[in-house]
Amino acid sequence: MGKLKLKLNIDISKVLATQGGKQAMLVIDDSAIARKTLSRNLEYYGFEVIEADAGIAGLKLFLERQREIAIVILDMVLEDVQGEVVLAKLQQLDPEVKVVVCTESASTEFKQTGQKVAGVLRKPIATDRLLKVIHLALGGSAADVEA
């Protein structure tokens, strides 16, 4: 993995090296187009991506592969279960889990009801914004991210 070239001075491999061997991203989104686009963008920059097309499927994959997952990218609007429920369950399974939540509507506010998230993304997701949020969520320095 090399340095990213999108207005960023980030070496993602260095940030991932601090994650105790966790290298994968779990993407939970019931929209196939959104999920595949996000996955392709992440894979392009060297991330291993695990995909789930529903909240329950995402929770099962998290349970099975928790040791590999550095971060979860969670769509808050899912057909099978509300994103807030999935978030709460992920945090119950692993209180240290890093979750970036996604929403399609700019008017939709993510309400933190005792749940902490590592970042919030609005759809459609710009690649540079995605990478910045992941970098910061994984403990990367804000000084590495140009304004």
Question: Which functions belong to the PLM regions below?
Answer:
Residues E51-I71:
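Acidic, metal-coordinating helix/loop segments flanking the phosphotransfer/catalytic sites
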Residues D75:
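Active-site residues of response regulator receiver
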Residues K123:
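A Lys-centered signature of the CheY-like receiver
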Residues V100-E104:
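Hydrophobic/aromatic residues positioned on beta-strands within the core alpha/beta folds
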Residues M1-L26, S39, E68, K116, ...:
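Non-catalytic signal-transmission and effector/linker regions of two-component phosphorelay proteins
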Residues K60-L63, E84-E96:
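Short amphipathic alpha-helix used as the core "switch/output" element in two-component signaling
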Residues A32-I50:
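Two-component/phosphorelay signaling modules centered on CheY-like receiver
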Residues E79:
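The feature encodes the CheY-like receiver
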